[in-house]
């Protein structure tokens, strides 16, 4: 795995140097340095799970060792997903007025960057299609790749819009529901974090995505389960372990926990939620967390987790292809009972 990650990071360097020599634009030294620094700061810094999953999935679908060329192409698609993630995060952080990301200041918070970050986000988005053109233009699935990235980007941006407009305006908990939570998560997270990697691997394997709607549905369910875990960890796990400070309560987010709490609360408890949810005051946040404990949301989550796992395993095992089953089980194995 360490060897694969090293190969994957090597491909990043190749793709980056191609982008910095792109003949469609006349770079100056200053503009080239800016793009290099911006890309290095935002693209390769995460866990790289989405990108590496393309290689894993393709290998399982092919059922044998990959050639160097195949590893390179699967890595290039993996990096396109990491570039997509970087583009969303750079812009998300501006919208959310965030301060840190992956343990360092958000890009727009870096001195002399500021609102230039908005254009940098757009540039990162454009890099994806330059990479696809450079390496996949002659492939029979090139148009399908373009369609796939465009559609997933549209779904993610629409999910982000839902998330933003649901926590905007007057703090009104009555607009939160399990179906709103599910819809936000499905579009904002599940398509690009779960479906996209496998869809890339399927296209590389010569498959038609229209024949794999069942795979998409399973991965979307997995993405929803992943986000519910995220909502739970945001509140119940030590930020030192998590690597970030959870602010869902302060930010009035439509999180699974608050939706569950509303479902289980009596009138008195609902009053506590209404008075304290979405406020930055640490005492109010503590009151919400105390109510979550009182309602045994830890137990509710454990119950949700085991039921989701059972359901997913059943769906996966009913799939006719053992190779596809292996891909889906590998994804589920990475996230089941995770602690961060």
Swiss-Prot record:
Class in the EC hierarchy, top level: transferase
Cofactor stoichiometry and binding remark: Binds 2 Mg(2+) ions per subunit.
Source domain of life: Eukaryota
Tissue: Mainly expressed in trichomes and flowers, and, to a lower extent, in leaves, roots and stems.
Requisite cofactors: Mg(2+)
Enzyme Commission number, as recorded: 2.5.1.10, 2.5.1.1
This protein's pathway: Isoprenoid biosynthesis; farnesyl diphosphate biosynthesis; farnesyl diphosphate from geranyl diphosphate and isopentenyl diphosphate: step 1/1; Sesquiterpene biosynthesis; Isoprenoid biosynthesis; geranyl diphosphate biosynthesis; geranyl diphosphate from dimethylallyl diphosphate and isopentenyl diphosphate: step 1/1
Gene Ontology BP terms: cholesterol biosynthetic process; farnesyl diphosphate biosynthetic process
Residues the entry annotates as binding dimethylallyl diphosphate: 101, 188-189, 227, 244, 253
Family designation: Belongs to the FPP/GGPP synthase family.
Protein name in the entry: Farnesyl pyrophosphate synthase 1
